[in-house]
């Protein structure tokens, strides 16, 4: 089996959340679980921004769900959606 690139959209709880601090928490929590390829800020509207987290992980059953659960459990995160999964 190979690896997959999964893109997660992470929405903060509040428009006033510090996204750089949230990005640091994401990197800390996912350290050792998967490799973070990139994290980009996405403008949603009305001042709301999301983080698009590109994570590389083994193509194993349940791995993307595990990472999504870890992201959802981070303080300051309101919602996590899986945007894209691609075999690499």
Swiss-Prot record:
One of its GO terms (molecular function) is translation elongation factor activity. Disulfide bonds: none annotated. CDD domains: EF1B. Keywords: Elongation factor, Protein biosynthesis. SMART domains: EF1_GNE. Gene3D superfamilies: 3.30.70.60. Promotes the exchange of GDP for GTP in EF-1-alpha/GDP, thus allowing the regeneration of EF-1-alpha/GTP that could then be used to form the ternary complex EF-1-alpha/GTP/AAtRNA. Belongs to the EF-1-beta/EF-1-delta family. This is Elongation factor 1-beta. The lineage of its organism: Archaea, Methanobacteriati, Thermoplasmatota, Thermoplasmata, Thermoplasmatales. The gene is ef1b.
């Amino acid at each position: 089996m190979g690896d997959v690139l999964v893109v997660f959209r992470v929405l903060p709880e509040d428009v006033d959340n510090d996204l750089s601090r949230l990005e640091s928490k994401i990197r800390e929590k996912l350290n050792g679980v998967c490799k973070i390829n990139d994290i980009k800020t996405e403008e949603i509207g009305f001042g709301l921004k999301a983080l698009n987290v590109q994570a590389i992980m083994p193509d194993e059953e349940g791995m993307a769900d595990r990472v999504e659960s870890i992201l959802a459990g981070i303080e300051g995160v309101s919602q996590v959606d899986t945007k894209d999964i691609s075999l690499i």
